[in-house]
Amino acid sequence: MSITPPFLLACIDLRGAELTATQLRATLPRGGADVEAVLPTVWPIVQAVAECGADAALEFGALFDGVRPPTVRVPDAALDAALAGLDPDVRDALQVMIERTRVVHADQRRTDVTTALGPGATVTERWVPVERVGLYVPGGNAVYPSSVVMNVVPAQTAGVDSLVVASPPQFTSGGRFHGLPHPTILAAARLLGVDEVWAVGGAQAVALLAYGGTDSDDCELAPVDMITGPGNIYVTAAKRLCRSRVGIDGEAGPTEIAILADHTADPAHVAADMISQAEHDEMAASVLVTPSTDLADATDAELAAQLRTTVHRKRVVAALGGRQSAIILVDDLEAGVKVVNLYAAEHLEIQTAEASRVASRIRCAGAIFVGPWAPVSLGDYCAGSNHVLPTAGFARHSGGLSVQTFLRGIHVVNYTKTALKDISGHVITLAKAEDLPAHGEAVRRRFAR
Protein backbone atom coordinates (compact mmCIF):
# COMPACT_ATOMS: atom_id res chain seq x y z
CA MET A 1 0.00 0.00 0.00
CA SER A 2 1.07 3.59 -0.39
CA ILE A 3 0.65 6.48 2.00
CA THR A 4 -0.03 9.78 0.28
CA PRO A 5 -0.03 13.30 1.73
CA PRO A 6 -1.57 14.83 3.70
CA PHE A 7 -2.22 11.63 5.59
CA LEU A 8 0.58 10.39 7.83
CA LEU A 9 -0.58 6.99 9.09
CA ALA A 10 2.29 4.50 9.29
CA CYS A 11 2.15 1.04 7.73
CA ILE A 12 3.62 -1.94 9.59
CA ASP A 13 3.99 -5.00 7.38
CA LEU A 14 3.96 -8.22 9.42
CA ARG A 15 3.34 -10.53 6.47
CA GLY A 16 5.76 -13.42 6.64
CA ALA A 17 7.00 -12.35 10.08
CA GLU A 18 7.29 -14.67 13.05
CA LEU A 19 4.60 -13.39 15.40
CA THR A 20 6.18 -14.15 18.75
CA ALA A 21 5.01 -12.26 21.81
CA THR A 22 8.43 -10.67 22.23
CA GLN A 23 8.56 -9.46 18.64
CA LEU A 24 4.99 -8.16 18.66
CA ARG A 25 5.49 -6.22 21.88
CA ALA A 26 8.50 -4.53 20.28
CA THR A 27 6.78 -3.89 16.95
CA LEU A 28 3.16 -2.95 17.63
CA PRO A 29 2.42 0.77 17.82
CA ARG A 30 1.83 2.12 21.28
CA GLY A 31 2.27 5.65 22.51
CA GLY A 32 1.09 6.00 26.04
CA ALA A 33 1.98 8.56 28.62
CA ASP A 34 5.04 8.40 30.84
CA VAL A 35 3.38 8.58 34.24
CA GLU A 36 6.70 8.06 36.01
CA ALA A 37 8.02 11.28 34.49
CA VAL A 38 5.36 13.46 36.12
CA LEU A 39 5.33 11.83 39.56
CA PRO A 40 7.87 14.37 40.94
CA THR A 41 5.58 17.17 39.75
CA VAL A 42 2.41 15.64 41.17
CA TRP A 43 3.79 14.49 44.52
CA PRO A 44 4.04 18.03 46.02
CA ILE A 45 0.43 18.68 44.95
CA VAL A 46 -0.76 15.55 46.73
CA GLN A 47 1.27 16.42 49.83
CA ALA A 48 -0.06 19.98 49.96
CA VAL A 49 -3.68 18.88 49.64
CA ALA A 50 -3.15 16.14 52.24
CA GLU A 51 -1.85 18.76 54.67
CA CYS A 52 -4.02 21.78 53.82
CA GLY A 53 -7.14 20.26 52.29
CA ALA A 54 -9.57 22.31 50.24
CA ASP A 55 -7.60 25.55 50.45
CA ALA A 56 -4.64 23.94 48.72
CA ALA A 57 -6.87 22.27 46.11
CA LEU A 58 -8.54 25.58 45.29
CA GLU A 59 -5.18 27.36 45.07
CA PHE A 60 -3.86 24.79 42.61
CA GLY A 61 -7.05 25.15 40.59
CA ALA A 62 -6.56 28.90 40.40
CA LEU A 63 -2.93 28.39 39.37
CA PHE A 64 -3.53 25.76 36.69
CA ASP A 65 -7.03 26.58 35.43
CA GLY A 66 -7.29 30.29 36.12
CA VAL A 67 -10.48 29.95 38.15
CA ARG A 68 -11.22 29.57 41.85
CA PRO A 69 -14.79 28.79 42.93
CA PRO A 70 -15.92 30.18 46.30
CA THR A 71 -16.45 26.64 47.64
CA VAL A 72 -15.50 23.16 46.53
CA ARG A 73 -18.98 21.72 46.90
CA VAL A 74 -21.40 22.82 44.20
CA PRO A 75 -24.62 24.29 45.68
CA ASP A 76 -27.85 22.34 45.20
CA ALA A 77 -29.35 25.35 43.44
CA ALA A 78 -26.66 25.16 40.76
CA LEU A 79 -27.43 21.48 40.14
CA ASP A 80 -31.13 22.26 39.83
CA ALA A 81 -30.46 25.19 37.49
CA ALA A 82 -28.19 23.07 35.29
CA LEU A 83 -30.85 20.40 34.89
CA ALA A 84 -33.56 22.98 34.22
CA GLY A 85 -31.41 24.59 31.53
CA LEU A 86 -30.36 21.35 29.83
CA ASP A 87 -31.24 21.08 26.15
CA PRO A 88 -34.33 18.81 25.92
CA ASP A 89 -32.77 16.62 23.22
CA VAL A 90 -29.61 16.13 25.29
CA ARG A 91 -31.73 15.34 28.35
CA ASP A 92 -33.72 12.73 26.43
CA ALA A 93 -30.54 11.15 25.06
CA LEU A 94 -28.95 11.06 28.52
CA GLN A 95 -32.09 9.50 29.96
CA VAL A 96 -32.01 6.75 27.32
CA MET A 97 -28.31 6.20 27.99
CA ILE A 98 -28.94 5.94 31.74
CA GLU A 99 -31.81 3.49 31.30
CA ARG A 100 -29.91 1.21 28.92
CA THR A 101 -26.79 1.28 31.09
CA ARG A 102 -28.85 0.42 34.17
CA VAL A 103 -30.42 -2.59 32.41
CA VAL A 104 -27.03 -4.05 31.46
CA HIS A 105 -25.40 -3.40 34.82
CA ALA A 106 -28.34 -4.75 36.83
CA ASP A 107 -27.52 -8.22 35.49
CA GLN A 108 -23.94 -7.95 36.79
CA ARG A 109 -24.91 -7.82 40.48
CA ARG A 110 -23.56 -10.88 42.25
CA THR A 111 -25.54 -12.74 44.90
CA ASP A 112 -24.19 -14.22 48.11
CA VAL A 113 -23.27 -17.91 47.84
CA THR A 114 -23.03 -20.41 50.68
CA THR A 115 -20.99 -23.58 50.19
CA ALA A 116 -21.42 -26.55 52.54
CA LEU A 117 -18.28 -28.65 52.97
CA GLY A 118 -19.95 -31.14 55.30
CA PRO A 119 -22.35 -31.19 58.26
CA GLY A 120 -21.92 -27.94 60.21
CA ALA A 121 -19.20 -26.57 57.91
CA THR A 122 -20.07 -23.67 55.61
CA VAL A 123 -18.31 -20.83 53.85
CA THR A 124 -20.42 -17.96 52.57
CA GLU A 125 -19.14 -15.39 50.11
CA ARG A 126 -20.88 -12.09 50.82
CA TRP A 127 -20.68 -9.23 48.33
CA VAL A 128 -20.50 -5.90 50.12
CA PRO A 129 -20.35 -2.51 48.36
CA VAL A 130 -17.63 0.03 48.98
CA GLU A 131 -19.11 2.65 51.32
CA ARG A 132 -18.00 5.93 49.72
CA VAL A 133 -16.70 6.48 46.19
CA GLY A 134 -15.27 9.48 44.36
CA LEU A 135 -15.99 9.61 40.63
CA TYR A 136 -13.69 11.82 38.58
CA VAL A 137 -15.05 13.40 35.38
CA PRO A 138 -12.43 15.25 33.30
CA GLY A 139 -12.69 18.56 31.48
CA GLY A 140 -10.31 19.39 28.64
CA ASN A 141 -11.08 19.10 24.93
CA ALA A 142 -14.66 17.94 25.41
CA VAL A 143 -17.49 17.72 27.93
CA TYR A 144 -18.15 14.20 29.21
CA PRO A 145 -21.60 13.76 30.78
CA SER A 146 -21.38 10.19 29.47
CA SER A 147 -18.53 9.57 31.93
CA VAL A 148 -20.82 10.63 34.77
CA VAL A 149 -23.30 7.96 33.69
CA MET A 150 -20.67 5.27 33.16
CA ASN A 151 -19.19 5.77 36.63
CA VAL A 152 -22.34 6.44 38.63
CA VAL A 153 -24.61 3.67 37.30
CA PRO A 154 -22.44 0.66 38.27
CA ALA A 155 -21.67 2.24 41.65
CA GLN A 156 -25.36 2.78 42.37
CA THR A 157 -26.21 -0.71 41.12
CA ALA A 158 -23.59 -2.16 43.47
CA GLY A 159 -25.27 -0.36 46.37
CA VAL A 160 -22.63 2.27 47.15
CA ASP A 161 -24.17 4.51 49.83
CA SER A 162 -22.23 7.71 49.22
CA LEU A 163 -21.09 9.11 45.86
CA VAL A 164 -19.25 12.31 45.06
CA VAL A 165 -18.54 13.52 41.53
CA ALA A 166 -15.48 15.74 41.07
CA SER A 167 -15.04 17.76 37.88
CA PRO A 168 -12.92 20.83 37.06
CA PRO A 169 -14.46 24.29 37.39
CA GLN A 170 -14.86 25.91 33.99
CA PHE A 171 -13.83 29.41 32.95
CA THR A 172 -14.81 31.41 29.92
CA SER A 173 -14.13 35.03 29.06
CA GLY A 174 -17.81 35.73 29.66
CA GLY A 175 -17.72 33.94 32.99
CA ARG A 176 -20.90 32.07 32.14
CA PHE A 177 -19.96 28.96 34.12
CA HIS A 178 -19.24 31.02 37.27
CA GLY A 179 -16.38 28.74 38.33
CA LEU A 180 -18.58 25.64 38.34
CA PRO A 181 -18.13 22.38 36.43
CA HIS A 182 -19.74 22.38 33.01
CA PRO A 183 -23.54 22.60 33.40
CA THR A 184 -24.06 19.42 31.35
CA ILE A 185 -21.93 17.55 33.90
CA LEU A 186 -24.01 19.02 36.73
CA ALA A 187 -27.25 18.15 34.94
CA ALA A 188 -26.15 14.55 34.37
CA ALA A 189 -25.30 14.20 38.06
CA ARG A 190 -28.71 15.56 39.02
CA LEU A 191 -30.48 13.21 36.59
CA LEU A 192 -28.72 10.30 38.29
CA GLY A 193 -29.64 11.47 41.77
CA VAL A 194 -26.12 12.48 42.78
CA ASP A 195 -26.29 15.53 45.03
CA GLU A 196 -22.62 15.87 46.01
CA VAL A 197 -20.49 17.43 43.27
CA TRP A 198 -17.10 19.06 43.82
CA ALA A 199 -15.78 21.84 41.60
CA VAL A 200 -12.19 20.66 41.57
CA GLY A 201 -10.10 18.97 38.90
CA GLY A 202 -6.69 17.56 38.12
CA ALA A 203 -4.29 15.93 40.55
CA GLN A 204 -5.60 18.15 43.34
CA ALA A 205 -9.08 16.65 42.92
CA VAL A 206 -7.74 13.12 43.34
CA ALA A 207 -5.78 14.15 46.44
CA LEU A 208 -8.78 15.90 47.97
CA LEU A 209 -10.98 12.87 47.34
CA ALA A 210 -8.37 10.67 49.00
CA TYR A 211 -7.62 12.84 52.03
CA GLY A 212 -10.74 14.97 52.46
CA GLY A 213 -10.78 18.32 54.18
CA THR A 214 -12.95 21.25 55.19
CA ASP A 215 -14.63 23.46 52.61
CA SER A 216 -14.42 27.25 52.59
CA ASP A 217 -17.82 27.40 54.32
CA ASP A 218 -16.59 25.01 57.06
CA CYS A 219 -18.56 22.04 55.69
CA GLU A 220 -16.80 18.68 55.81
CA LEU A 221 -15.48 17.19 52.59
CA ALA A 222 -15.31 13.56 53.67
CA PRO A 223 -12.61 11.36 52.12
CA VAL A 224 -13.62 8.43 49.93
CA ASP A 225 -12.70 4.77 49.97
CA MET A 226 -12.27 4.43 46.20
CA ILE A 227 -11.65 6.71 43.21
CA THR A 228 -12.73 5.85 39.67
CA GLY A 229 -12.83 7.67 36.36
CA PRO A 230 -10.43 8.72 33.60
CA GLY A 231 -8.22 11.80 33.44
CA ASN A 232 -5.01 13.20 32.03
CA ILE A 233 -1.51 12.07 32.93
CA TYR A 234 -1.49 14.18 36.11
CA VAL A 235 -4.75 12.66 37.31
CA THR A 236 -3.34 9.20 36.59
CA ALA A 237 -0.16 10.01 38.50
CA ALA A 238 -2.17 11.26 41.47
CA LYS A 239 -4.24 8.07 41.50
CA ARG A 240 -1.03 6.05 41.57
CA LEU A 241 0.34 8.12 44.45
CA CYS A 242 -2.90 7.85 46.45
CA ARG A 243 -3.57 4.17 45.92
CA SER A 244 -2.03 3.20 49.24
CA ARG A 245 -4.79 5.25 50.88
CA VAL A 246 -7.74 4.55 48.56
CA GLY A 247 -8.70 1.98 45.99
CA ILE A 248 -8.59 2.95 42.32
CA ASP A 249 -10.18 1.46 39.23
CA GLY A 250 -6.96 1.57 37.22
CA GLU A 251 -4.65 3.93 35.37
CA ALA A 252 -6.39 5.15 32.24
CA GLY A 253 -4.18 6.25 29.37
CA PRO A 254 -5.10 7.82 26.03
CA THR A 255 -8.04 6.17 24.30
CA GLU A 256 -7.43 3.58 21.59
CA ILE A 257 -9.26 1.63 18.92
CA ALA A 258 -8.08 -1.43 17.02
CA ILE A 259 -10.05 -2.75 14.06
CA LEU A 260 -9.57 -6.30 12.78
CA ALA A 261 -11.02 -6.26 9.27
CA ASP A 262 -10.93 -8.24 6.05
CA HIS A 263 -11.95 -7.56 2.45
CA THR A 264 -15.65 -7.57 3.40
CA ALA A 265 -15.33 -4.44 5.54
CA ASP A 266 -16.55 -1.07 4.31
CA PRO A 267 -13.51 1.27 4.22
CA ALA A 268 -15.77 4.26 4.88
CA HIS A 269 -16.91 2.65 8.14
CA VAL A 270 -13.37 1.72 9.12
CA ALA A 271 -12.04 5.22 8.45
CA ALA A 272 -14.93 6.89 10.28
CA ASP A 273 -14.38 4.72 13.34
CA MET A 274 -10.64 5.43 13.39
CA ILE A 275 -11.31 9.17 13.18
CA SER A 276 -13.97 8.97 15.90
CA GLN A 277 -11.41 7.83 18.46
CA ALA A 278 -8.62 10.06 17.14
CA GLU A 279 -10.73 13.15 17.85
CA HIS A 280 -10.43 12.54 21.61
CA ASP A 281 -6.88 13.89 21.80
CA GLU A 282 -3.55 13.94 20.00
CA MET A 283 -2.32 10.88 21.90
CA ALA A 284 -5.31 8.70 20.92
CA ALA A 285 -4.44 5.52 19.04
CA SER A 286 -6.16 4.22 15.91
CA VAL A 287 -4.95 0.87 14.56
CA LEU A 288 -6.21 -1.18 11.62
CA VAL A 289 -5.14 -4.84 11.39
CA THR A 290 -5.95 -6.49 8.07
CA PRO A 291 -4.77 -9.13 5.59
CA SER A 292 -6.32 -7.11 2.75
CA THR A 293 -4.07 -4.61 0.98
CA ASP A 294 -7.10 -3.43 -0.98
CA LEU A 295 -8.89 -2.54 2.25
CA ALA A 296 -5.74 -0.85 3.58
CA ASP A 297 -5.44 1.34 0.49
CA ALA A 298 -9.16 2.11 0.41
CA THR A 299 -9.16 3.00 4.11
CA ASP A 300 -6.16 5.27 3.61
CA ALA A 301 -8.03 7.07 0.82
CA GLU A 302 -11.19 7.32 2.93
CA LEU A 303 -9.25 8.79 5.83
CA ALA A 304 -7.83 11.48 3.59
CA ALA A 305 -11.28 12.23 2.18
CA GLN A 306 -13.10 12.30 5.52
CA LEU A 307 -10.43 14.47 7.11
CA ARG A 308 -11.42 17.30 4.78
CA THR A 309 -14.66 17.75 6.70
CA THR A 310 -13.59 16.60 10.17
CA VAL A 311 -14.31 19.32 12.74
CA HIS A 312 -11.29 18.60 14.93
CA ARG A 313 -8.99 17.98 11.97
CA LYS A 314 -5.76 19.21 13.56
CA ARG A 315 -6.22 17.00 16.60
CA VAL A 316 -7.20 13.98 14.49
CA VAL A 317 -4.26 14.34 12.09
CA ALA A 318 -1.87 14.54 15.04
CA ALA A 319 -3.34 11.38 16.56
CA LEU A 320 -3.35 9.41 13.31
CA GLY A 321 0.17 10.55 12.50
CA GLY A 322 1.56 9.66 15.92
CA ARG A 323 3.64 6.58 16.67
CA GLN A 324 0.64 5.08 18.46
CA SER A 325 -1.41 4.70 15.24
CA ALA A 326 -0.84 2.46 12.21
CA ILE A 327 -2.22 0.17 9.55
CA ILE A 328 -0.85 -3.33 10.20
CA LEU A 329 -0.74 -5.86 7.36
CA VAL A 330 -0.90 -9.56 8.29
CA ASP A 331 -0.92 -12.79 6.30
CA ASP A 332 -4.45 -13.85 7.25
CA LEU A 333 -7.15 -13.49 9.90
CA GLU A 334 -5.45 -16.16 12.01
CA ALA A 335 -2.42 -13.88 12.27
CA GLY A 336 -4.71 -10.90 12.81
CA VAL A 337 -6.34 -12.56 15.81
CA LYS A 338 -2.91 -13.21 17.30
CA VAL A 339 -1.90 -9.58 16.78
CA VAL A 340 -5.01 -8.03 18.33
CA ASN A 341 -4.92 -10.42 21.29
CA LEU A 342 -1.39 -9.30 22.03
CA TYR A 343 -2.23 -5.64 21.41
CA ALA A 344 -5.16 -5.88 23.88
CA ALA A 345 -6.97 -2.77 22.73
CA GLU A 346 -9.30 -0.68 24.85
CA HIS A 347 -11.85 -0.92 22.01
CA LEU A 348 -11.67 -3.70 19.42
CA GLU A 349 -13.93 -3.80 16.38
CA ILE A 350 -14.35 -6.99 14.36
CA GLN A 351 -15.35 -6.14 10.79
CA THR A 352 -14.91 -9.46 9.01
CA ALA A 353 -16.93 -12.25 7.48
CA GLU A 354 -18.39 -14.39 10.30
CA ALA A 355 -17.55 -11.62 12.75
CA SER A 356 -19.19 -13.36 15.73
CA ARG A 357 -17.04 -16.44 15.20
CA VAL A 358 -13.89 -14.34 15.00
CA ALA A 359 -14.93 -12.35 18.09
CA SER A 360 -15.28 -15.57 20.09
CA ARG A 361 -11.53 -16.09 19.69
CA ILE A 362 -10.60 -12.75 21.24
CA ARG A 363 -9.33 -13.05 24.80
CA CYS A 364 -7.73 -9.66 25.35
CA ALA A 365 -9.74 -6.48 24.80
CA GLY A 366 -11.49 -3.93 26.96
CA ALA A 367 -14.65 -4.27 24.86
CA ILE A 368 -15.39 -6.01 21.56
CA PHE A 369 -17.68 -4.52 18.93
CA VAL A 370 -18.94 -7.16 16.52
CA GLY A 371 -19.85 -6.52 12.90
CA PRO A 372 -20.55 -3.39 10.84
CA TRP A 373 -23.44 -2.16 12.99
CA ALA A 374 -21.66 -1.98 16.35
CA PRO A 375 -19.26 0.98 16.13
CA VAL A 376 -17.29 2.07 19.18
CA SER A 377 -19.36 5.27 19.27
CA LEU A 378 -22.37 3.12 20.17
CA GLY A 379 -20.48 1.78 23.16
CA ASP A 380 -19.41 5.27 24.14
CA TYR A 381 -23.02 6.25 24.65
CA CYS A 382 -26.02 3.98 24.23
CA ALA A 383 -25.03 0.31 23.84
CA GLY A 384 -25.59 -0.25 27.56
CA SER A 385 -22.01 -1.44 28.00
CA ASN A 386 -19.51 0.53 30.08
CA HIS A 387 -17.00 2.76 28.31
CA VAL A 388 -14.50 3.04 31.19
CA LEU A 389 -12.06 0.44 29.88
CA PRO A 390 -8.41 -0.61 30.31
CA THR A 391 -5.89 1.01 27.96
CA ALA A 392 -2.20 0.56 27.12
CA GLY A 393 -2.44 -3.23 26.94
CA PHE A 394 -3.91 -3.55 30.44
CA ALA A 395 -6.77 -5.58 28.92
CA ARG A 396 -4.37 -8.53 29.03
CA HIS A 397 -5.01 -8.71 32.78
CA SER A 398 -7.83 -6.28 33.63
CA GLY A 399 -11.42 -5.59 32.66
CA GLY A 400 -13.54 -2.48 32.37
CA LEU A 401 -15.50 -0.67 35.05
CA SER A 402 -18.44 -2.74 36.24
CA VAL A 403 -20.64 -3.41 39.23
CA GLN A 404 -17.91 -5.76 40.53
CA THR A 405 -15.49 -2.83 40.72
CA PHE A 406 -17.51 -1.46 43.63
CA LEU A 407 -18.06 -4.76 45.46
CA ARG A 408 -15.86 -6.59 47.95
CA GLY A 409 -16.12 -10.32 48.46
CA ILE A 410 -16.02 -11.32 52.14
CA HIS A 411 -15.75 -14.97 53.17
CA VAL A 412 -17.85 -15.81 56.22
CA VAL A 413 -16.65 -19.06 57.84
CA ASN A 414 -19.11 -20.90 60.09
CA TYR A 415 -18.12 -24.25 61.67
CA THR A 416 -19.67 -26.23 64.49
CA LYS A 417 -17.57 -27.96 67.15
CA THR A 418 -18.00 -31.31 65.43
CA ALA A 419 -17.10 -29.90 62.01
CA LEU A 420 -13.90 -28.35 63.38
CA LYS A 421 -12.94 -31.58 65.15
CA ASP A 422 -13.38 -33.54 61.93
CA ILE A 423 -10.79 -31.38 60.13
CA SER A 424 -8.56 -30.46 63.11
CA GLY A 425 -5.92 -33.12 62.46
CA HIS A 426 -5.18 -31.73 59.00
CA VAL A 427 -5.00 -28.17 60.34
CA ILE A 428 -2.50 -29.21 63.03
CA THR A 429 -0.40 -31.18 60.53
CA LEU A 430 -0.20 -28.28 58.07
CA ALA A 431 0.64 -25.80 60.85
CA LYS A 432 3.50 -28.05 61.94
CA ALA A 433 4.74 -28.38 58.34
CA GLU A 434 4.92 -24.59 58.06
CA ASP A 435 6.62 -24.28 61.49
CA LEU A 436 3.70 -22.30 62.89
CA PRO A 437 2.91 -24.44 65.95
CA ALA A 438 0.72 -21.79 67.60
CA HIS A 439 -1.70 -22.13 64.69
CA GLY A 440 -2.16 -25.80 65.47
CA GLU A 441 -2.29 -25.13 69.19
CA ALA A 442 -5.20 -22.69 68.67
CA VAL A 443 -7.21 -25.63 67.33
CA ARG A 444 -5.88 -28.32 69.71
CA ARG A 445 -6.73 -26.34 72.86
CA ARG A 446 -10.40 -26.25 71.89
CA PHE A 447 -10.52 -30.01 72.41
CA ALA A 448 -8.00 -30.32 75.28
CA ARG A 449 -10.61 -30.62 78.00
Curated annotation (Swiss-Prot):
Cofactor note: Binds 1 zinc ion per subunit.
Keywords: Amino-acid biosynthesis, Histidine biosynthesis, Metal-binding, NAD, Oxidoreductase, Zinc
Keyword Oxidoreductase part of the UniProt annotation: yes
A GO term for molecular function: zinc ion binding
Binding site for substrate: 255, 277, 280, 347, 380, 434, 439
Single GO cellular component term: cytosol
Gene3D superfamilies reported in the protein's UniProt record: 1.20.5.1300, Nitrogenase molybdenum iron protein domain
EC number(s) stated in the UniProt entry for this protein: 1.1.1.23
Listed PROSITE patterns: HISOL_DEHYDROGENASE
Catalytic activity: L-histidinol + 2 NAD(+) + H2O = L-histidine + 2 NADH + 3 H(+)
Record-listed NAD(+) binding positions: 136, 204, 232
Pathway membership: Amino-acid biosynthesis; L-histidine biosynthesis; L-histidine from 5-phospho-alpha-D-ribose 1-diphosphate: step 9/9
Function: Catalyzes the sequential NAD-dependent oxidations of L-histidinol to L-histidinaldehyde and then to L-histidine.
Protein name listed in UniProt: Histidinol dehydrogenase
Gene: hisD
